[in-house]
């Protein structure tokens, strides 16, 4: 079994950091990720810099990323202005977020869920016309910080609506880390049944220590792509307490011990997580860098 891990640390991982990370360090984070074997990277977001100052240098970051065959860089886009900026940087794919509840959608994007679907559809058409891959993420698919539980029926109805714009991929995001494996299986299997042939990706937070169990459940239910953030850094700036993306290195350890291939070197990602903690000025939440892999490498072994 092979799984694609989509690295989100450069965007989702850093966006909540109060201290602005130097552009050169953002580019180095991406370079190290590519060197470790990651082939899909969410590099930037093209959003209002007044709302997310950390992403104000999106164009400069994209200008400095290594262009390696087989590596795809994604940019988060909310509106036409963001898409204009993204297309000007030769981004490989755009990701658009549609939030599953009206309250969170208004807080995050200043629009209702229905308006978010309309925005996504318009952006998807423009991206397709420009030859850019387009993906859509349903945020708060497992629960909302303002409205509470979100029914599976409501999420799957939203899947049906966003699928009308023919996305290249649909993602389900546990934005505040409240999902559980049973719910993950229901939504992933339901999404796959509604959009056969469209890859399903999942984005989990480990806020309540369920992120890795949810990742395994997603794979069992048919998802083939998992988001993860080096060091376990990140979270949504518009969702209270939405900390703790699952850590790329910890996810890789789990997958590799289960004999699931990724093409990524966990030890290299772990070293990057340690380096990132030094850049940010505090240790990262990921555990592999502290505990080490298993079985331990023998002295002199390759």
List PLM regions with ranges:
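Catalytic cores and adjacent flexible loops of soluble metabolic enzymes
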Residues: 1-302
């Amino acid at each position: 079994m092979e799984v694609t891990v989509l690295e989100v640390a450069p965007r989702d991982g850093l966006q909540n950091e109060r201290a602005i990370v130097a552009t050169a360090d953002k580019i180095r984070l991406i370079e190290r990720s590519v060197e470790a074997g990651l082939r899909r990277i969410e590099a930037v977001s093209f959003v209002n810099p007044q709302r997310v100052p950390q992403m104000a240098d999106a164009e400069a970051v994209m200008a400095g990323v290594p262009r390696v065959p087989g590596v795809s860089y994604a940019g988060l886009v909310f509106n036409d202005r963001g898409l204009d900026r993204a297309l000007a940087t030769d981004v490989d794919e755009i990701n658009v977020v549609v939030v599953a509840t009206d309250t969170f959608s208004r807080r995050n994007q200043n629009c209702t869920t229905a308006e978010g679907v309309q925005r996504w559809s318009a952006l998807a058409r423009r991206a397709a016309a420009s030859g850019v891959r387009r993906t859509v993420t349903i945020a708060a698919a497992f629960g909302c910080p303002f409205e509470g539980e979100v029914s599976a029926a409501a999420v799957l109805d939203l899947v049906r609506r966003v699928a009308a714009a023919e996305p290249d991929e649909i993602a389900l995001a546990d934005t505040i880390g409240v999902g559980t494996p049973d719910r993950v299986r229901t939504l992933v299997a339901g999404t796959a049944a509604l959009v056969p042939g469209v890859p399903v990706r999942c984005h989990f937070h480990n806020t309540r220590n369920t992120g890795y169990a949810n990742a395994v459940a997603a794979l069992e239910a048919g998802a083939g792509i998992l988001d993860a953030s080096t060091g376990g850094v990140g979270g949504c700036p518009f969702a209270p307490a939405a900390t703790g993306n699952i850590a790329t290195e910890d996810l890789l350890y789990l997958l590799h011990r289960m004999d699931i291939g990724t093409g990524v070197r966990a030890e290299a990602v772990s070293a990057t997580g340690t380096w990132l903690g030094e850049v940010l000025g505090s240790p990262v939440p990921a555990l592999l860098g502290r505990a080490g892999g298993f079985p331990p490498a023998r002295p002199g072994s390759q």
